[in-house]
Amino acid sequence: MIDANLNRSTEGLRAIEDVLRFGYDDAALSGTARDLRHAFAKAGNLLAPRGLLLLSRDSAGDVGAGRWRSGGRRSAFKDMLFANFRRVQESARVLEESARLSGRPMAARRLQALRYRAYALEKGTWLKLGRR
């Protein structure tokens, strides 16, 4: 669960970063997304070493792999952008609660702060690009 949600959050942020960089040509917002992506990756180390997560990964045996379709159709960069903000925020919540359950309060606080940074980035993005 931790590995899947770390991947989901960093993949979502990569998609956000690329849309902001290549779709909207916005260096400031794409740089903020990049920094947030790196912060999520670093926070993941507070939950479990990356090597341990990789060793425990079982993509072939995952009962949920390939069963669900991705969200609705996306017809514009903006749709892709905000779908990925949801993905990042939801996975951050799962990671935060997993950290609490596993007795890692420092990791939980860090992940909560990252989730709120994702909310702030979404708002800043909407204010700057939402009308385009």
Regions found by a protein language model. Name each.
Residues 1-6, 11-132:
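Structural preference for solvent-exposed beta-strand-turn elements
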